[in-house]
Structure formats: C-alpha cells, structure tokens
C-alpha cells in the first residue's frame, strides 16, 4: 500500500509539474510583443524645416514632379476604403495606388497633410499630385476618354509608402500613445505635439487602421516579432483640413475651407483641450495637451515661411475645391486665403499657455 501510494503521489507531482510547464509555455506563446514595440516607439525625427520644398515634396526614387503626366496600366485589384481609387502598374512591375476625382476631398487632403507632417519631422507616406493616363481603366471611373483604351484622371494623386517595413497589421490607436516610455521612445512633448497637430488638421478618421507601426530599418529582420526602431505614423490623412465629423463625411471633413477656418484649435478658453470631435470609428477626440507638447509644435510651425505655406497649398491644388464643398455658389478659396487661415490657427497654438 505504501509503495502504491508513493507511486500515485509521484505521478501526480510529475503531472502537475508538466501542466505547470505547459501552462508557462502557453503563456509565453500568448505574450504579445506589440506592447513592447509601442512602448519604445518614436513619433518625430529632427529635420531641417527651412530646407523643405513643400511644392516639390519628398525627392528620391519613385518621386514625381508636380503635376507630372504618369502613364500606367489598370490593375483589377480591390483596395480598402470608400474614396475613389484604383491600383495601377507603371512600366513592368511598379504598382501604385491612385486616388482621383475633383469632388474627392482626399485628393487634396492627402497632399496637404502628408507634406505638412513630412516638413515638420513627423513622417508620412509620400503623396504626389499628378496627371494620370490609365490604360484599361473602367468607364465607370469617369475619366476623360482618350484613344487606345486610355483615360485621363486629373486631379489625381499617387501614393508611395514611407520607407521601412510595416510591423503587424493592426495599426495603432491614439490611446496607445500614452503607453510609450523609455529613453529611446518618444517623450510626452513629441506625442502631445502629434496629437495637437492632428487637432490642427482636423484628422477625422482616426481608427487604428489609419495609423501604422513602421520599422525604419531598410533590411528585413529575421524575426517578425522584433523591431529595433519602431516609428508610429499616420498613414491615411485624406479627411483633413475640414471639420472632423461623426460619420467621416467627405464634404465637411475633407478640405473644406469654411469649416476648417471657423474651427477653433482649442475647446474652451482655459484648459488646453484640443477641439477635435470624435468620429464614429475614431480613437482620438478632445485630447488634453501638455505645455511641453504645445510649445514643441508651436516652435515647429513657426519655422514654416510664408513661401513654404503658399507652396503647400499650391501643391494641394486647393483652388479646385469649393470653399464649402456641396455649396455650388460658395466659390473657391485661393492659396492666399488658406495661408491666412493656417497662420490664424497657428497663432492660436503659439499664444496659448497650458501650464
């Protein structure tokens, strides 16, 4: 009986130990490295703002000149999102995404917002305003028909992704910015500056899929769970420079001069709470901004010259967009009108104190 009892106890102990080991391994396997990556992410890099040519935009491989004519072959491929867009192939294998349509606010907003982020050091995808000649595009796209099964799209923009590799496929939520910590990570001043810039631009559609975690290293890493240099960036900025709306509607939210010019940067006269209404899918609304974040963004914005601001709105071709889209007799705002509105809103940030 004693030996039998001993064997039973031994078996039970071994079983318990094995279960504990399996449980530990299971917990290790379930551990998501995502939090660790976000905790040490950056959102801003030092840059020479005065040297930025906002009309030309980012140069280098894959860049296009302002309003360059680009010929491509239509690629029948489903793209995410609701705005007019299509995939197209330049040459043999250079696949690009084309956003198009004079009534599509994202055609203008993408250029304005990405150029501004790029100039200030927050990084973004590269968006180029071009004239696209598409071979084989469907008639329902309503391009201007040309001979040889070609159609022209103007205004249009071509997207080039930010250098690096996307980490994961979930994007990031604005609430996750508050998880960042550590010496290599973005300080609160940088994070609050990015939040305030999103308020300034009225970034309406802020769901996680509109932001990406990018590993800036050009070489692919062997272990997809690691990333030595994570950077949090905003990847879809079409619904900006209007007024953030519950439904992320194109006309009020995407480059609407009247709505943007009339929207105060701050909510109320005392606390530093950004005036950004929450959209149905958004993860950023009415953020509280620190004095360090306000000052950091103010110092960056003040480095932009009037020439650069004019170039920004010329690149965005704002003269093609009604002051109040949907209101046909609202007329068209000039680049000078937009520059004045930009500077007035910038002054609201510069003159505020959040201490």
Residue ranges and their predicted role:
Residues 105-110, 172-258:
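Conserved kinase catalytic-core segment
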Residues 219-355:
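C-terminal catalytic region of ATP-dependent kinase domains
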Residues 134-137, 213-220, 318:
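Short regulatory "switch" loops immediately downstream of catalytic or recognition motifs
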Residues 11-12, 16-76, 92, 315-355:
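Regulatory N- and C-terminal appendages and interdomain linkers associated
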Residues 61-172:
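Conserved ATP-binding subdomain of kinase catalytic cores across diverse folds
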Residues 118-122, 199-202, 347, 354:
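Sec-exported extracytoplasmic/periplasmic mature domains
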């Amino acid at each position: 009986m004693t030996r039998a009892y001993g064997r039973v106890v031994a078996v039970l102990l071994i079983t318990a130990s094995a279960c504990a080991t399996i449980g530990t391994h299971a917990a290790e396997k379930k551990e998501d490295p995502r939090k660790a990556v976000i905790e040490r992410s950056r959102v801003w890099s030092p840059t020479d703002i005065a040297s930025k040519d906002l009309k030309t935009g980012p140069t280098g491989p894959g860049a296009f000149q302002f309003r360059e004519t680009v010929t491509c072959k239509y690629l029948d491929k489903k793209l995410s999102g609701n705005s007019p867009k299509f995939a197209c192939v330049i040459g043999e294998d250079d696949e690009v995404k084309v956003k198009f349509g004079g009534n599509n606010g994202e055609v203008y907003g993408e250029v304005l917002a990405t150029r501004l982020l790029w100039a200030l050091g927050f990084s973004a995808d590269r968006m180029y305003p071009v004239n696209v000649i598409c071979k084989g595009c469907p008639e329902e796209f309503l391009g201007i028909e040309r001979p040889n099964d070609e159609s022209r799209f103007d205004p249009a923009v071509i997207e080039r992704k930010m250098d690096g590799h996307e980490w994961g496929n979930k994007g990031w939520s604005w609430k996750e910015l508050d998880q960042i910590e550590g010496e290599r990570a973005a300080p609160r001043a940088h994070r609050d500056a990015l939040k305030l810039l999103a308020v300034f631009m009225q970034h309406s559609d802020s769901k996680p899929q509109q932001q990406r975690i990018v590993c800036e290293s050009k070489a692919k890493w062997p272990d997809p769970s690691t990333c030595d240099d994570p950077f949090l960036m905003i990847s879809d900025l079409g619904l900006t420079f209007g007024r953030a709306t519950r439904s992320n509607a194109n006309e009020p939210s995407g480059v609407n001069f009247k709505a943007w010019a009339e929207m105060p940067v701050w909510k109320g006269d005392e606390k530093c709470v950004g005036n950004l209404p929450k959209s149905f899918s958004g993860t950023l609304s009415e953020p509280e901004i620190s004095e360090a974040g306000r000052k950091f963004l103010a110092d960056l914005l003040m480095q932009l010259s009037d020439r650069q601001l004019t170039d920004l709105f010329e690149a965005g071709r704002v003269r093609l967009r009604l002051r109040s889209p949907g209101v046909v007799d609202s007329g068209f705002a000039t680049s000078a009108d937009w520059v004045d509105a930009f500077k007035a809103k910038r002054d609201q940030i510069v003159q505020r104190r959040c201490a």
